[in-house]
Amino acid sequence: DPVGHVNNNAYGLFIENARTVLFMDVENKIKSELDSSSKCDWVLRKLDIDFLREIHYPGEVDVGIAITRIGTSSMVVNHGVFTSGYCAATAVGISVYFDLETRSSTPIPEKIQQAMLK
């Protein structure tokens, strides 16, 4: 960007990508145990990013992710964005399990809850 570092919007993309990969990996591992007729997915309700240091381009970015709380229909996910040996940002997100037909939150199936905690 004009300031000479990775724009703050890119941090959100790094975080979203890590969260999406986690959710896909977990659901793929237990796919055979899930109701195949279910039309549910995850939506982001809230994302709070604390920008700690700049990220310069080009470079590599790693995102660490940890589920810190699972509720009935949502979970809290903590993230750390790392580059060049330091933490550039931390973030806390709330993801909601969302019924694509009713367009509303729905309870997270127990199988998914258990798999997310492993």
Where are these regions (language model features)?
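Terminal targeting signals and extreme-terminal segments of soluble enzymes
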Residues: 1-62, 68-118
